[in-house]
């Protein structure tokens, strides 16, 4: 079990990294492959040496793949910027991943609506 202070620090660092990556993505990356992307979460490893950056991409799966390629190409630039802006001696290794949870959320809501309609029909 890790001390609460370490977990708190790691969570705060993850949130600061998320905000900085959002800022970098909004105006500093000129890669045409990167579409409309937002950072939903940054999940830090226990040792804070790596971070999984969860991104939402507007568009279809092809658009998501192109954006992921662009983000991975810009990974070292983003790490360098994080080190400077947050004054990190060793910025975490970044791993970009498409966050599909919002799509699953919509699907679950759709299934719940169907179940409600069925139960209403049975009650009638």
Residue ranges of model-derived segments:
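Charge-rich, low-complexity N-terminal segments
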Residues: 1-50, 56-124
């Amino acid at each position: 079990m890790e001390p609460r202070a370490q977990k708190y620090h790691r969570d705060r660092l993850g949130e600061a990294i998320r905000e900085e990556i959002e800022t970098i993505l909004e105006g500093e990356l000129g890669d045409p492959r990167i579409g409309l992307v937002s950072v939903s979460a940054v999940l830090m490893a226990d040792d804070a040496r790596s971070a999984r950056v969860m991104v939402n991409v507007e568009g279809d799966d092809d658009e998501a793949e192109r954006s992921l390629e662009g983000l991975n190409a810009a990974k070292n630039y983003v790490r360098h910027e994080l080190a400077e802006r947050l004054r990190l001696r060793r910025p975490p290794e970044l791993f970009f991943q498409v966050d599909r949870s919002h799509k699953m959320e919509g699907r679950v809501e759709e299934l719940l609506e169907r179940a409600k309609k069925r139960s209403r029909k049975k009650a009638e």
